[in-house]
């Protein structure tokens, strides 16, 4: 039976180092070895490195830089000149018009919503519709006359139809649409006078084209009712094209008559008639002097 004073059987036995010095060596301390100081890597960041540059390339860059600076100065000068001219024109009451219509290929300046008084915008839009209607009528007239030419009516009527289109489209804009636009925008009585004169000629032409009497080449250079009846019996397709042109010219005539009535009512009601007479008298006096 084990003695109650026997040592603990579970205690760790003392380790004996067989290589220990028999004479007794002081035990090693738990202190660790101090780390070695870091050695510098062989990169000298403070040293500058001379990279050989291409002097010719540097001179080209400097030359281009000077050219760019000169161009920039020239653009600034032009911008200042343009701003000065715009300011001078604004002080003088001159309106600088920027082409904005049609949107895909601007040819004219057209901004009814911002330049025409609100109570006149509807009438201006309808007048613009009559101008576009004239363009449509003359274009369809070319198509109808082309079919007649193909069917053997001769090339002369086609050339006349082309002349109507080339003269009528810009003529309508310059002679009566633009004067009314200017009259509504600037309240000019003389512009109203120009509009009335040439718009009445426009209405007369549309009525004449709708009838197309046999005055010039039996009237077949215009797609009216008389040539439509004439060619319908022998050439049905040509007759149909002429009847469509007749309908277009009739519609253009009716709407144009309504427009000139409305413009004249506004002209009389606003007292522009007396103003136009005074402006005409002053213009005649200046011309005489």
Swiss-Prot record:
Q: List the disulfide bonds.
A: none
Q: How does it sit in the membrane?
A: Multi-pass membrane protein
Q: Which residues lie on this side of the membrane: Cytoplasmic?
A: 1-124, 261-289
GO CC list: endosome; Golgi apparatus; nucleus; plasma membrane; trans-Golgi network; transport vesicle membrane
One biological process GO term for this chain?
Answer: protein transport
Q: Does the keyword Phosphoprotein apply?
A: yes
Q: Which controlled-vocabulary keywords does the entry list?
A: Cell membrane, Coiled coil, Cytoplasmic vesicle, Membrane, Phosphoprotein, Transmembrane, Transmembrane helix, Transport
Pfam families, sorted: SCAMP
Q: Where are the transmembrane segments?
A: 125-145, 157-177, 192-212, 240-260
> Modified residue Phosphoserine is at which positions?
34
> What is the similarity comment for this entry?
Belongs to the SCAMP family.
Q: What's the protein here called?
A: Secretory carrier-associated membrane protein 3
The top of its lineage is:
Eukaryota, Viridiplantae, Streptophyta, Embryophyta, Tracheophyta
What is this protein's gene name? SCAMP3
């Amino acid at each position: 039976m084990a003695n109650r004073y026997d040592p603990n059987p579970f205690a760790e036995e003392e380790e004996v180092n067989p290589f220990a010095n028999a004479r007794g060596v002081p035990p090693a301390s738990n202190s660790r070895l101090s780390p070695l100081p870091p050695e510098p890597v062989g990169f000298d960041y403070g040293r500058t490195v001379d990279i050989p540059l291409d002097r010719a390339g540097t001179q080209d860059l400097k030359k281009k830089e000077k050219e760019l600076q000169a161009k920039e100065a020239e653009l600034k000068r032009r911008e200042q000149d343009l701003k000065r001219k715009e300011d001078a024109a604004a002080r003088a009451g001159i309106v600088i018009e920027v082409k904005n219509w049609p949107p895909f290929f601007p040819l004219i300046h057209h901004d009814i919503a911002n330049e025409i008084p609100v109570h006149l915008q509807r009438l201006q839009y309808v007048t613009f519709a009559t101008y576009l209607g004239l363009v449509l009528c003359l274009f369809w007239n070319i198509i109808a006359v082309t079919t007649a030419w193909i069917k053997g009516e001769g090339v002369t009527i086609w050339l006349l139809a082309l002349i109507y289109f080339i003269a009528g489209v810009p003529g309508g804009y310059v002679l009566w649409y633009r004067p009314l636009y200017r009259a509504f925008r600037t309240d000019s009585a003389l512009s109203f006078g120009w509009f009335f004169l040439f718009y009445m000629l426009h209405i007369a032409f549309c009525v004449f084209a709708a009838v197309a009497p046999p005055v010039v080449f039996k009237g077949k250079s215009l797609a009216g009712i008389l040539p439509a009846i004439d060619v319908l019996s022998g050439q049905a397709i040509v007759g149909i094209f002429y009847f469509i042109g007749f309908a277009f010219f009739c519609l253009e005539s009716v709407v144009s008559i309504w427009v000139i009535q409305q413009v004249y009512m506004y002209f009389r009601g606003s007292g522009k008639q007396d103003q136009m007479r005074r402006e005409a008298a002053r213009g005649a006096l200046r011309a005489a002097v």
